[in-house]
Amino acid sequence: MRIVIQKVSQAMVKVDNEIVSQIAKGYMLLVGISTEDTIADAQKLSNKVLNLRLFETGDQFWKHSIQDVQGEILSVSQFTLMARTKKGNKPDFHKAQKGEHAQELYNQFLDLLKTTLGADKVKDGQFGAMMSCSLTNEGPVTIILDSTE
């Protein structure tokens, strides 16, 4: 499982030019699920997302987690994070988990976040849809998490 986590002051997802989710201060997550991922990977990375200290107090950086600041999370499934580009110029997506299985694990990941942060604090896009994402990245702070590391 791979996640790109971005600290944001606001983020929004649209499908067919309609807003489906939006948040204020918090994280925008892009979540890729591989064919090898299990619930253990979802547990590991949900714990990391919830406890990673990316927020500051005054001039003291890296002091507070998303829980500490009562921030929100906007999560978007993104199979393209599993792309391999070693050969040629066309991305290879064979390592990306297929539809139904990916959606099941993705939903379990969201449930883990909601259990700790609260269902009202965790939003997501529309699984499998073509989405338009917009955000204001603060810092900018962008970190890549990988359950194999």
Curated annotation (Swiss-Prot):
SUPFAM superfamilies: DTD-like
Main location: cytoplasm
Assembly description: Homodimer.
UniProt comment concerning the protein's domains: A Gly-cisPro motif from one monomer fits into the active site of the other monomer to allow specific chiral rejection of L-amino acids.
Designated gene of the protein: DTD1
Any Pfam family matching the protein: Tyr_Deacylase
Protein name: D-aminoacyl-tRNA deacylase
Subcellular location: Cytoplasm
